[in-house]
């Protein structure tokens, strides 16, 4: 029997976050990089509560990093925005590599300046896995063809290098929206680049191009970078109860389109509900991950059997008035619904409308 530890990761614990962007300028283009950074500074200065520092390596002056300190929710809102894409655009033509690292601040010594939040109240327990998602839409009417293309490709090689491994890839659709989730042990960006280079994956991506609502040209680095930046949907919360894995465990994705401006609040609500549910050993949801980008919220749940046996817990609306709170944040019309689910029957109906169609779920063999 497979067992797993209790794990919990969240962007909603109120702690401050240190963001470090490692920059490798193209050879002999350092001055262009500095000029591009000067352009960025003006835009960064216009973002409330944001400042950054440009640092140059003492050992290797060609290596740079840009650091900034945030509260996690406003950072996630900004990094997923069109304004962020425009802000970093000047860097794209003069750097070979950009790598972003994000850390919650756990301990602090000294310092008396104002802060945007507190410290992490407890050290998080992780499982060595990074979770990420991509989402995009295809042209209406092409859904069946897209599902066929996505279901038919050969899985890429799981091992990226000695320290990075692609553990699981799952694809879902809801109407004309595609969601691809990945679990990676090690370096997420290295794994994504590894997957993108695989011939079978490139063939699928090319076959998808005519069906996409947003145009992209994968032979143009800037076009490809912009597409995947807009498609990125980071995990804002993950919790797993741990212990022996129940028999018949299945993964579902639930789609929660939020009302304008309510995406972060909806993701926060679901995250808190999942933390509560994880403390109940008899609950049906053994693990849950919330992904959010603007008004798009997707929640992965692992449940044994049929989630309709307990639709309230499966949807994350257990507890007093939680269904009403969800209804205020959810764009019910986008799911073909009106009003909060006030009965188990209505909760089952919401679950049916929110449940995404599984296209493929591939796990790498255990090493």
From Swiss-Prot:
Residues 15-106 form the ABM domain. Pfam families: ABM (PF03992), SchA_CurD (PF04486). GO terms for biological process: antibiotic biosynthetic process. Keywords: Antibiotic biosynthesis. InterPro entries: ABM_dom, Dimeric_a/b-barrel, SchA_CurD-like. Pathway: Antibiotic biosynthesis; curamycin biosynthesis. SUPFAM superfamilies: Dimeric alpha+beta barrel. It comes from the Bacteria. Belongs to the SchA/CurD family. This is Polyketide synthase CurD. It comes from Streptomyces cyaneus. The gene is curD.
């Amino acid at each position: 029997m497979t067992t797993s530890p209790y794990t919990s990761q969240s962007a909603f614990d109120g702690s401050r976050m240190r963001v470090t962007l490692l920059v490798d300028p193209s050879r002999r283009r350092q001055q262009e990089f500095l000029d591009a950074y000067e352009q960025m500074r003006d835009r960064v200065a216009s973002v409330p509560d944001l400042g950054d520092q440009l640092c140059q390596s003492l050992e290797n002056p060609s290596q740079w990093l840009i650091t900034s300190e945030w509260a996690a929710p406003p950072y996630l809102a900004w990094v997923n925005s069109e304004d962020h894409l425009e802000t970093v655009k000047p860097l794209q033509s003069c750097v070979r590599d950009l790598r972003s690292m994000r850390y919650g601040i756990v301990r602090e010594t000294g310092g008396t300046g104002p802060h945007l939040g507190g410290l992490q109240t407890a050290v998080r327990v992780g499982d060595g896995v990074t979770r990420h998602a991509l989402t995009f839409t295809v042209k209406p009417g092409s859904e069946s063809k897209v599902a066929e293309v996505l279901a038919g490709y050969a899985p890429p090689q799981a091992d990226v290098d000695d320290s990075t491994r692609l553990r699981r890839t799952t694809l879902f659709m809801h109407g004309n929206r595609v969601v691809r989730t990945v679990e990676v042990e090690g370096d997420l960006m290295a794994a994504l680049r590894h997957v993108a280079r695989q011939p079978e994956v490139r063939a699928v991506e090319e076959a998808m191009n005519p069906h996409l609502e947003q145009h992209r040209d994968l032979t143009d680095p800037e076009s490809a970078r912009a597409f995947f930046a807009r498609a990125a949907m980071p995990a804002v919360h993950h919790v797993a109860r741990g212990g022996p894995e129940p028999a018949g465990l299945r993964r579902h994705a639930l789609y929660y389109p939020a009302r304008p401006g309510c995406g972060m609040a909806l993701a926060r609500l679901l995250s808190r509900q999942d933390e509560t549910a994880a403390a109940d050993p008899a609950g049906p949801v053994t693990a849950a991950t919330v992904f959010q980008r603007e008004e798009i919220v997707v929640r992965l749940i692992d449940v044994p059997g049929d989630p309709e046996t307990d639709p309230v817990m499966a949807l994350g609306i257990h507890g007093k008035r939680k269904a009403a709170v969800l209804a205020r944040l959810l764009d019910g019309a986008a799911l073909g619904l009106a009003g909060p689910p006030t009965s188990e029957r209505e909760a089952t109906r919401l679950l049916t409308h929110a449940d995404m169609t599984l296209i493929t779920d591939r796990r790498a063999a255990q090493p």
